[in-house]
Amino acid sequence: MVMAQKLKEAEITEQDSLLLTRNLLRIAIFNISYIRGLFPEKYFNDKSVPALDMKIKKLMPMDAESRRLIDWMEKGVYDALQRKYLKTLMFSICETVDGPMIEEYSFSFSYSDSDSQDVMMNINRTGNKKNGGIFNSTADITPNQMRSSACKMVRTLVQLMRTLDKMPDERTIVMKLLYYDDVTPPDYEPPFFRGCTEDEAQYVWTKNPLRMEIGNVNSKHLVLTLKVKSVLDPCEDENDDMQDDGKSIGPDSVHDDQPSDSDSEISQTQENQFIVAPVEKQDDDDGEVDEDDNTQDPAENEQQLARVKDWINSRHLDTLELTDILANFPDISIVLSEEIMDQLVTEGVLSKTGKDMYIKKRDKTPESEFTFVKEEADGQISPGKSVAPEDYLYMKALYHSLPMKYVTITKLHNMLDGEANQTAVRKLMDRMTQEGYVEASSNRRLGKRVIHSSLTEKKLNEVRKVLATDDMDVDVTETINKTNGPDAKVTADVSTCGGIHSIGSDFTRTKGRSGGMQQNGSVLSEQTISKAGNTPISNKAQPAASRESFAVHGGAVKEAETVNCSQASQDRRGRKTSMVREPILQYSKRQKSQAN
C-alpha cells in the first residue's frame, strides 16, 4: 500500500516520459509485426513488461530484415524523438515500395513546453467540456493514469488487428517520418532514413480504408496518439459506402484524441473492457451508463441530444459528419447518434448534404453569404470588420478552384500552401459541391469537374475583390522592386498569414522583420524569424488577425509584408518528410523458407 502511494506521488521526469513513449512504440511495432504475420513466429520471444503488467512478443534480430526494422526504431526514430523533431511516424505495409497501401499505423507526437510543462493539443473533450483547452500535464497526469492509458491503447490495438483479414504474402514494409518544421534543421536525417520527394511522400489507396483512432497516452511531457488505416477490413462493404474521410466501425472504437479527466477514474474491472465493437456497457465521464441499443430511455436520449446540439453550436466549422459525433462522443452508440442527427435535421439545426454528411443551417440565404464582399467593393466595410478565418480560407479555395476545369483534393491542398490539412480541404470541396460550384461525381483520374456558369463567374469576381492580389500568390521579385528603397524595414505580424492559426502545428507563425531579405527576394534570412523556444509548441497562441491587421501607415499594406507572408507560404510547401533508405521487401517464397 505504501509502495503504491509512493508510485502515485512519484514525479514524472522528462526522461521517464521519453522512455515510456519509446517502450510503447516498441510494444506497438512488435505487436503489429507479430499479429499481422510480418515475420515468422520463431523470430519473437515472450517478454514481460512489469511497468504495464503485460506480456508482449519481442522481435529478435534473426535476419537482415528483422535487424533492419529494429534499427529503424532504435537508431532512427528514437533519434528524432529525443530531439523533439518527430511529429508523425507512419509504419506502412504496401503492395510495393510505391504503393498501393495495405495498412498504415500512424503515431503522432506532441511535446511539452520545457518551461510551463503544458502539453499543447487540439483538444475537443467529450462530455460537457465542449470548449476544450490546454491540458495541464503537471496537475493532471499521474503514473497510474499513464499506465491505464497505455494498457488501454495496446489492448485496443491488439483487438483491432485480430479482426482484420490476413495480410497478403507479398508486401513491402516502409516507415516514413514527418517533422515539426519550425525546429527541425532542413538537412537533418536520422540514421537509416533519407529525405523523400513529394511524390514519395504521397499515399495511394486503391479503395477507401477502414480508419480508426486507437487512443493516446499522455506521459506528462509527451503525448503519443495512434491511428490505424487498413483495406483488410472484413466489413469493407459498409466502408465502401463511406466518404474518403474514413469511418470507424463503432463508437467505442474511436477513443479521445486527447486525455480527459476520466482516465484517472478507470477502475480495475473497466480495464479489461476495451472493445472494438459496441457490445458492452461502459461508464462515461459523468458516471452514466450506456443503454443497450434495444433499450430506449427518453430522458437519457434527450440529454444526449442536448450534449450533441451544444457541441455542434460551439463548432466554428459549418460542415460535419457522423464520424465527428462518434469521435467526440464515444459513449453514444451508432444507432443513437444517427437518431440524434436525424432529429437535428428535423429541428432545422442541420441540413443533410450526403450520406452521413451535414452542414449547419444559417439564418442568411446563400445569396447573402458573402454580402461583406459587396459592401467592401462599395467602400461600406467598417474599419473594424474582419473576415472569419473559415470563410477566408473558403474564399481562397474558391479563388484557386473556380478557374480550373477539374479540381482534386491534392491539387487544392498544394495550392493552399499547407494552410489547411487534407481533411479540411476535403470539407471545403464538400462545401463547394453543396453550393453548386463543383459536381458531386468525381473522375478517378481528373477529380471533380468545376461547373462554369454565370453564378460561378460572379462568385469568382466577388472573391477576387475581397482577397485582392496582396493576399494571394505574389511575384516576390516584383514586390521587392516596389518597396520604398532597399533598406525599407517594416515589422510585420505574420502569425496568422492566410487567416488561420493553430497551436503546435505547421500553421503557427512568428513575428518577422522584412529587412533581412536578400535582394532577389528568393531567400528569407534565418534572422528574420524570432523563435520563442526550442520545442514545437513553445509559441503560445495569438489571436487570429483579419486582413486589416496587416495595414500600417494609414491602411496601406507594405509590399515587404506581403513578401513575408508569401515566403511563409513557400516554406510551408516544402514540408520535410523522410523515409527509410531500404524498405523491407517480403515475398511468399522467402517467407516459407524462413518458416521451415
UniProtKB/Swiss-Prot annotation:
The UniProt record lists the keyword Hydrolase: no
GO cellular component: chromatin; chromosome; condensed nuclear chromosome; nucleoplasm
Domain spans labelled HORMA: 15-228
Keyword match Signal: no
PROSITE patterns: HORMA (PS50815), SWIRM (PS50934)
Sequence ranges assigned to domain SWIRM in this UniProt record: 351-449
Compartments in which it is found: Chromosome; Nucleus
Keywords: Chromosome, Meiosis, Nucleus
Chief location of this protein within or outside the cell: nucleus
Quaternary structure and partners: Interacts with ASY3.
Protein name per Swiss-Prot or TrEMBL: Meiosis-specific protein ASY1
